Amino acid sequence: MTATATEPPAATRSVPVISPAPLVPVADFGPVDRLNGWAMTSVVTALAALTRFLNLGSPTDAGTPIFDEKHYAPQAWQMLYNHGVEDNPGYGLVVHPPVGKQLIAIGEALFGYNGLGWRFSGAVLGVVMVALVARIARRMSRSTMVGAIAGLLLISDGVSFVAARTALLDGFLAFFVVAAFGALIVDRD
């Protein structure tokens, strides 16, 4: 073979690299037991619903709100019937953003101004948060068992239990934080 002016000399030619690794990383979308994963999520979510909704509207102290429910339940009721405006003369008490109180107002619109109405939205989001934690843990660990354990741990957590069964704003905040974290985990993949 004759050399041309455009061909590099034999000593400087690049030698193809042969590697046992694939050239493109293989996409890993998590565990392959999808049916078991959704069955686990359904069972854990049903258990969470049982614990969060059982006797949710039972009267406390003659039907009065407990702890800070005495602020948030009336403010949500006011927002419901005053087109989103609180007419609270103690404007110094209106220190929290309205989203949590608007969510409480949804329950009050459905069930009235009572314990079930105050606490319904928090219980729904508390149940959804358990499902989110189970799915997030499963996705991060690639293990259905780890996802189930994470969901069960959140079900048995006392703070999560109380936040989901009362009309306090902490449970709503926790739900949105977990949902945002879940969105980041999905976006990472």
Question: What is the predicted role of each segment?
Answer:
Residues M1-D189:
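Membrane-integral, polyisoprenol-dependent glycosyltransferases
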